[in-house]
Curated annotation (Swiss-Prot):
Gene source species: Brucella abortus (strain 2308)
Keywords (A to Z) from UniProt: DNA-directed RNA polymerase, Nucleotidyltransferase, Transcription, Transferase
Annotated disulfide bonds: none
Complex and partners: The RNAP catalytic core consists of 2 alpha, 1 beta, 1 beta' and 1 omega subunit. When a sigma factor is associated with the core the holoenzyme is formed, which can initiate transcription.
A GO CC term attached to the entry: DNA-directed RNA polymerase complex
Name this polypeptide is given: DNA-directed RNA polymerase subunit beta
GO biological-process terms attached to the record: DNA-templated transcription
Catalytic activity, reaction form: RNA(n) + a ribonucleoside 5'-triphosphate = RNA(n+1) + diphosphate
One annotated GO molecular function: DNA binding
Enzyme class: transferase
Pfam families registered for this protein in UniProt: RNA_pol_Rpb2_1, RNA_pol_Rpb2_2, RNA_pol_Rpb2_3, RNA_pol_Rpb2_45, RNA_pol_Rpb2_6, RNA_pol_Rpb2_7
Domain of life of the native organism: Bacteria
Length: 1377
């Protein structure tokens, strides 16, 4: 077993602490997006045999379209996609949408209609391909490129179609009575509500409109009163027996009743039960067994019953009494008078069976189907007079027309399950049986039988992913189109047109564009780091069109539900108004074809846990008992304990092991990806875990990524599935590597029709949506052998194929002079100087030269009134050089705009004529660096409109691009040649030649020496005598020629795209994009966090020598406040600190053994230590089978710290941490004596010290700090704008005014409210005074006062400001007068 597992140093090796084996493979993390959209487009399916779903279903549902007269019909045949015009990178660069043209084949059939018989015969059939706009395609990473930016379509959670029963929880009526209601929700169409009111009458509502008695709806379905009653109630027959009546006795009916008068056997006359006693269920059953058939009833017992059928005089046809009438003395007399001896009564006892439907029928004014239909028509279309036809058509179209009403397959399945029906799932409209079943079930609920539905159960909520959302949107577009097509078919001469002339595809294309551009669910991708991308694609939102709104969503919808287990993460959700409405899919969850979330379970057969995995939705899981993943099992897979903790029907309980039939697959199946990345999650408080999982998404990719010492084993999965790290598509040998690409010669999965070369282009310093930097680095060397799935390049925030969002830093938990008060963080200067938390951010600046009314704008270096110094970074075309260092206010692109001619004085005209002065008619509108930004120009792109002459800069960029493409082509060609000629040489070596190149003797044996005498291109001239081989040679040749042609064609196509002008928005002649990169070191004011919700702001950066240090002189990197732990209850960070300390200790030990090896060449101690760290089990690397080179590689990898994995809920326990600390030769307390860096004295107590994984978050002080002297003002109030984006000022608000008032600082207050704010004249004067060096000013009237006066005038109050102050007061009258 010497070298079965090759270790090439290209992956991070982790020591696993998990004890539970991984049985099921975790599904691909972005499967949700990709599978859904693939199912919608079905690009791979042959166009003839596509199943009826996705796009195919949309076309099938709208077509065929008939014109109004039925003389012609437009049918859908199939659809196809042409290859996309631009690839993903080109679309990103040119601000285009990555999409493929959709071609639909339509068939127009024209009929001849016989005027006499009305019979149709086909006159003409025309088929044609019609272009139906572009359909956006999904990239390999599950995103869409729309107008050059990457977007994600978030999946939506909504209420599943079907029927739901609920009550108002007693809130509607003051008595607190429960009012039950049923609601039938279709996928599309009208909602049907059936509800009780406080008087127990059953009402129906259609589309939340005015309510109607439910019996009206039943009558409209064609039932009459008697039929309705017989459907809902059983009947009891009272038989006349002398003066008394007999009632048949049934135990069911009488059990539980309190007997008012004696129960008398009608046959024997004996009293079987005295009055006042209660008839228990047991006693009732015993009476029946004794042979009690009927009991005596008096006339009083009949009163209050209801007739089950009409009482009719058959001779005259007169109806004496109607079904449902209540029996009183008068009715009874009528019955006796008519000579009835048997009366059929409805079986209503007001206890088990209520008279709700009978009472509703009594309230209902409608007597017939026509009246009922008219009533429904009046509610749905108020103000229109109903006719029988229109009412019938309208009622039919509400629930029974598949065009207007669709329950969807899900809705039908759910309805069948809830109501015990057995309709096919192709029946997608309502039936009479369905409506009756709903009303019956509702009445049962009111009678106290059955359960209401829980709408927050995941069995009643489903996920609409990209494909389905897109399908609905496209259907809307096609339906808009359908109207236009119908009108056009009727209005033009149908014989002469082709399908193309009938179709205007704009509405369909517009619907798609609108969805991707402005839907609430189409979001700008969060691309801060690979984790945030993956989380964004796995997000589930309850908001959006057809979903909830933040204001209306109550507590229950947001709460965690038992069915979330293994489906939706209970931890990861935003803080704030969206809490619980936006969720994340759990790690192992997947969405089934009906849109329900499924979670995997292991089957338990005969008490033994098998490795059989089944995926179940919440509905299917309800009937099982599910054990947890960490239940103790014996060797055979049986449960060790007699009683096992398990989940059953939403409750957690102890169940005997025989009853358990399923078991969780993995402990991490209940949390999301982000939460599964937090080690010791089980020791953190849920609120802090929520913050931790949310903050990991905000971590900025650092210049040097470093994987955590303490991980969870999820890191490589996230890095691979997010597409940040590049995995090999197939095995092979590395042929070439440089920073921008990797070329691999394939040796596995060789397909003769495809190239034998895989070229992987790496992204270099690209800007992400959040301005972070995307940069990939190769991990392989030339000559390496690669297997499929190996990581060959690291991306942003990945390290050897592991997700690496932050850095491992040495932390001490202790207060330090108040600098870590209130979660502040004290950092060592070493962290800044070593660029530990340095990140690169790339800003994009764009400038466009437009064609204005006064003439075109121009991008140029010749700008009026600008010094040569300011132009030093611009080339002759006026565009900044790559590599230039730019600062706030520097010109990036020089641009001038023509300005309107102002009338010139004669002197100006003369000067203009003499000096030819041109500068006066243009103004400088150059693109300058905004305040507070600086950096280095890393890339410039120039786009020109078709037909506009290119400047020198654009030509240079173009040449560079073409050179790069040519290099790619040449490399691919070289590898192709090597491959093909190698195979050719193998095939003909040692064969007898039948012919050959010029001067070659026939019949000679071909050898490799002989071949070298001829140039390779002449080898094809060798012909061999073996005909079969000759055929193979010819096949190889034609394949080689095809590959060469394909390569050349691809190259020419790309060159043509580069040289061709760009598509620009209207009015734009030329566009320049400048990318500026800035290196941001960490500084006070930046936000940092650990993975446990322990966040803080950097308060001070201390010189290294002042930081606390250990006995061996190692200084702490970071000092955190220990008071941040106890109240927050995120103890995980302390366990991580200890374990990180042990990892670093082990690393140090291995480093020492490496030094020993270098001196003595004895590798054994090193091998033994590594084998001890990685014991042989199925989770750890098989270090025992490593050869010496691999051992040295591994030792070099782990000498800074051994990486370990502690999976969530199955991680390292205290004993493991102690053992590892002991192995590393450290104290098991995890504490050390620290010395004060300023005095050199030891601190009084030992301090917890260790390694924590810290992240730098995307809340950087550079983006927030902002100052303004003068800037823009609001138009109306003339006050400065607010906010950094508007270059606004500080608002001196109401409360601040109170503060100055309280101080009595009148003059300060006056200038705050006037010249420093919105006194326009005053502030100009102050400016002039300051320029003069004068310090006096006079306050005028603030503009906001004028606004107030205007507002009052708009209300009709004429307010005038009287500012005519009397110059002098009138003199006081003399005393004498």
């Amino acid at each position: 077993m010497a070298q079965t597992h090759s270790f090439n140093g290209r992956k991070r090796v982790r020591k696993f602490f998990g004890k539970i084996p991984e049985v099921a493979e975790m599904p691909n993390l972005i499967e949700v997006q990709k599978a859904s959209y693939d199912q919608f487009l079905m690009v791979e399916e042959p166009s003839g045999g596509r199943p009826d779903e996705g796009l195919q279903a949309v076309f099938k549902s709208v077509f065929p379209i008939q014109d109004f007269s039925g003389a012609s019909m437009l049918e859908f045949v199939r659809y196809e996609f042409d290859p996309p015009k631009f690839d993903v990178d080109e679309c990103r660069q040119r601000d285009l949408t990555y999409s493929a043209p959709l071609k639909v084949t339509l068939r127009l059939i024209v009929f001849d209609i016989d005027e006499d018989t009305g019979a149709k015969s086909i006159k003409d059939i025309k088929e044609q391909d019609v272009y139906m706009g572009d359909m956006p395609l999904m990239t390999d990473n599950g995103t869409f490129i729309v107008n050059g930016t990457e977007r994600v379509i978030v999946s939506q959670m909504h209420r599943s179609p079907g029927v739901f029963f609920d009550h108002d929880k007693g809130k509607t009526h003051s008595s607190g009575k429960l009012l039950f209601a049923a609601r039938v929700i279709p996928y599309r169409g009208s909602w049907l509500d059936i509800e009780f009111d406080s008087k127990d009458i059953v009402y129906a509502r259609i589309d939340r409109r005015r309510k109607l008695p439910a019996t009206t709806l039943l009558m409209a379905l064609g039932m009459d009163g008697e039929e309705i009653l017989s459907t809902f109630y059983k009947t009891v027959t009272y038989t006349r027996d002398g003066d008394n009546w007999r009632i048949p006795y049934s135990a069911e009916r009488f059990k539980g009743m309190k007997i008012i008068s004696d129960l008398v056997d009608a046959d024997t006359g004996e009293v079987v039960l005295e009055a006042g006693k209660k008839l228990t269920a047991r006693a009732a059953k015993q009476l029946a067994e004794k042979g009690l058939k009927a009991i005596k009833a008096t006339e009083d017992d009949l009163f209050g019953s209801y007739l089950a059928e009409d009482v009719v005089n058959y001779a005259t046809g007169e109806i004496y009494l109607e079904a449902g009438d209540e029996i009183d003395e008068k009715v009874l007399k009528t019955l006796i008078d008519t000579g009835e001896t048997e009366i059929n009564v409805l079986d209503i006892d007001h206890v088990n069976i209520g008279a709700y439907i009978r009472n509703t029928l009594a309230v209902d004014k409608n007597e017939s189907r026509q009246e009922a239909l008219f009533d429904i028509y009046r509610v749905m279309r108020p103000g229109e007079p109903p006719t029988m036809d229109s009412a019938e058509a309208m009622f039919h179209s509400l629930f029974f027309d598949s065009e207007r009403y669709d329950l969807s397959a899900v809705g039908r399945v759910k309805m069948n399950m809830r109501l015990d029906l057995d309709a096919e799932d192709t029946v997608r409209v309502l039936r009479k049986e369905d409506i009756l079943a709903v009303v019956k079930m509702l009445v049962e609920l009111r009678d106290g039988r059955g359960e209401i539905d829980d709408i927050d159960n995941l069995g009643n909520r489903r996920v609409r992913s990209v494909g389905e959302l897109m399908e609905n949107q496209y259907r809307v577009g096609l339906l808009r189109m359908e109207r236009a097509i119908k009108e056009r078919m009727s209005s033009i001469e149908i014989d002469t047109v082709m399908p193309q002339d009938l179709i205007n595809a704009k509405p369909a294309a517009a619907a798609v564009r609108e969805f991707f551009g402005s839907s609430q669910l189409s979001q700008f991708m969060d691309q801060t780091n690979p984790l945030s991308e993956i989380t964004h694609k796995r997000r589930l939102s309850a908001l959006g069109p057809g979903g909830l709104t933040r204001e209306r969503a109550g507590f229950e919808v947001r709460d965690v539900h038992p069915t979330h287990y293994g489906r939706i993460c209970p931890i990861e959700t935003p803080e704030g108004p969206n809490i619980g409405l936006i969720n994340s899919l759990a790690t192992f969850a997947r969405v089934n074809k009906y849109g329900f979330i499924e979670s995997p379970y292991r089957k338990v057969v005969d008490g033994k846990v098998t490795n059989d995995v089944v995926y179940l939705s919440a509905m299917e899981e309800a009937k099982h008992s599910v054990a947890q993943a960490n239940v103790e099992l014996d060797e055979q897979g049986g449960f060790v304990d007699e009683f096992v903790i398990c989940r059953h029907a939403g409750e957690v309980m102890m169940a005997p092991r025989e009853n358990v039939d399923l078991m969780d697959v993995s402990p991490k199946q209940l949390v999301s990806v982000a939460a599964a990345l937090i080690p010791f999650l089980e020791n953190d408080d849920a609120n802090r875990a929520l913050m931790g999982s949310n903050m990991q998404r905000q971590a900025v990719p650092l210049v040097r990524a470093e994987a955590p010492f303490v991980g969870t084993g999820m890191e490589p999965i996230v890095a691979r599935d997010s597409g940040a790290a590049i995995a090999a598509r197939r095995g092979g040998i590395v042929d070439q590597v440089d920073a921008t690409r990797i070329v691999i010669r394939a040796t596995e999965e060789l397909d003769p029709s495809k190239s034998g070369v895989d070229i992987y282009r790496l992204q270099k310093f690209q800007r992400s949506n959040q301005s972070t930097c995307i940069n990939q680095r190769p991990l392989v060397r030339v000559g390496d052998r690669i297997h499929k799935g190996d990581i060959i390049a690291d991306g942003p925030s990945t390290d050897l194929g592991d997700l690496a969002l932050g850095r491992n830093v040495l932390v001490a938990f202790m207060p330090w002079n108040g600098y870590n008060y209130e979660d502040s963080i004290l950092l060592s200067e070493k962290i800044v100087s070593d660029d530990v938390f340095t990140s690169i951010h790339i800003e994009e600046f764009e400038v466009a030269a437009r064609d204005t009314k006064l003439g075109p704008e121009e991008i140029t270096r010749d700008i009026p009134n600008v010094s040569e110094e300011a132009l030093k970074n611009l080339d002759e075309a006026g565009i900044v050089y790559i590599g230039a260092e730019v600062h706030p206010g520097d010109i990036l692109v020089g641009k001038i705009t023509p300005k309107g001619e102002s009338p010139m004085t004669p002197e100006e005209k003369l000067l203009r004529a003499i000096f030819g002065e041109k500068a006066s008619d243009v103004r400088d509108t150059s693109m300058r660096m905004p305040p507070g930004t600086y950096g280095t120009v890393v890339e410039v792109r120039v786009f020109n409109r078709h037909g506009v002459e290119k400047d020198e800069r654009a030509m240079a960029i173009e040449r560079e691009e073409i050179e790069r493409l040519a290099k790619d082509r040449d490399d691919e060609q070289a590898i192709l040649d090597r491959n093909v000629y190698g195979r050719l040489a193998d095939m003909i070596d040692g064969k007898v030649a039948a012919a050959g190149p010029k001067g070659f003797k026939k019949g000679t044996t071909i050898t490799r020496e002989l071949m070298t005498e001829y140039p390779r291109s002449q080898w094809w001239q060798f012909a061999v005598e073996d005909e079969k081989l000759q055929g193979e040679l010819e096949a190889l040749r034609s394949q080689y020629d095809d590959s060469k042609k394909l390569l050349e064609a691809r190259f020419m196509d790309k060159v043509e795209k580069v040289q061709r002008g760009d598509e620009m928005p209207p009015g734009v002649m030329k566009m320049v994009k400048v990318f500026v990169a800035v290196k941001r070191k960490i500084q006070p004011g930046d936000k940092m966090a650990g993975r446990h919700g322990n966040k803080g702001v950097v308060s001070r950066i201390l010189p290294v020598e002042d930081m606390p240090f250990l006995e061996d002189g190692t200084h702490a990197d970071i000092v955190l406040n220990p008071l941040g732990v106890p109240s927050r209850m995120n103890v995980g960070q302390i366990l991580e600190t200890h374990l990180g300390w042990a990892c670093a200790g082990m690393g140090k030990k291995i480093g020492e053994l490496l030094d020993v090896y270098r001196k003595t060449a004895n590798i054994e101690p090193l091998r033994q230590t590594l084998e001890h760290i990685y014991p042989d089990n199925d989770r750890n690397e098989p270090v025992r089978s490593y050869d010496d080179d691999a051992i040295l590689m591994l030792a070099n990898q782990v000498k800074r710290g051994v990486s370990i994995a502690t999976p969530v809920f199955d991680g390292a326990v205290e004993a493991d941490i102690n053992a590892m600390l002991t192995d590393a030769g450290l104290a098991t307390s995890g504490q050390s004596t620290l010395y004060d860096g300023r005095t050199g004295e030891p601190f009084d107590r030992q301090v917890t010290m260790g390694y924590i994984y810290m992240l730098k978050l995307h809340h950087l002080v550079d983006d927030k700090i902002h100052a303004r002297s003068i800037g823009p003002y609001s138009l109306v109030t003339q006050q400065p704008l607010g906010g950094k984006a508007q270059f606004g000022g500080q608002r001196f608000g109401e409360m601040e005014v109170w503060a100055l008032e309280a101080y009595g600082a009148a003059y300060t207050l006056q200038e705050m409210l006037t010249v420093k704010s919105d006194d326009v004249a005053g502030r100009t004067k102050v400016y002039e005074a300051i320029v003069r060096g004068d310090d006096t000013f006079e306050a005028g009237i603030p503009e906001s006062f004028n606004v107030l006066v205007k507002e009052m005038r708009s209300l009709g109050l004429n307010v005038e400001l009287d500012d005519t102050r009397e110059a002098e007061q009138p003199a006081l009258p003399d005393a004498a007068e």
